[in-house]
Amino acid sequence: QIDKIKNWVGKGNTLITIARGSSWAINSELINESLVESKKDSTYTRKRYVDAREHIGRERIGGSILSADLDLTHPLAFGYNDKSIPVYKNNNVFINKTKSDYSSVAIYSKDFHIDGYISDANKKDYVPRSASLIVSKIGSGRVIVFADNPNFRGTWYGTNKLFLNAIFLGNNISVPTN
């Protein structure tokens, strides 16, 4: 199935992925991008089973508002006038900034935390190294990769224009190489 999708995109088509779909595209090697990896702790400490739910839950992002820095010259940013854009993040999908200098459309701002709970580990280790929106090239086509859901419940209007631009302008976006 991956080869069929890769072949279809490579013929000049556009695929749009959102959140866990973006994670799937990276993990299945559909696109040549990567997720931000956790820093490995070389010391092993056994943890009590009874604490698992609390420890794992602490790292989840249930709903936070983060600030992203938008490249206003990119076609996906058509119609935006301010490079600072609030994005709603309710997942732990952290996508590395692209290898191409021109394809990280929205990266999280230096002072990214606007509102909502986000753990210290996510603040320090993940978000600063991540992009909210990238474009990845496959042959003559492209995959538009959203780390966050730009259409969250139909209530988050600040980023849905990015999604509409992906739909209507996607086939006209080229991915310059360095």
Ranges and model annotations:
Residues 23-115:
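An acidic, glycine-rich "communication" segment
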Residues 1-25, 140, 146, 166:
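Short alpha-beta junction capping motif
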Residues 1-2, 9, 17-18, 61, ...:
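Active-site-proximal structural scaffolding
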Residues 3-5, 54-55, 63-65, 90-93, ...:
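Generic recognition of flexible, low-complexity loop/linker segments
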Residues 9, 13, 29-32, 80, ...:
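Alpha-helix capping/termination and helix-coil
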Residues 81, 85, 101, 107-178:
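Extracellular ligand-binding/catalytic regions of CAZymes and related secreted enzymes
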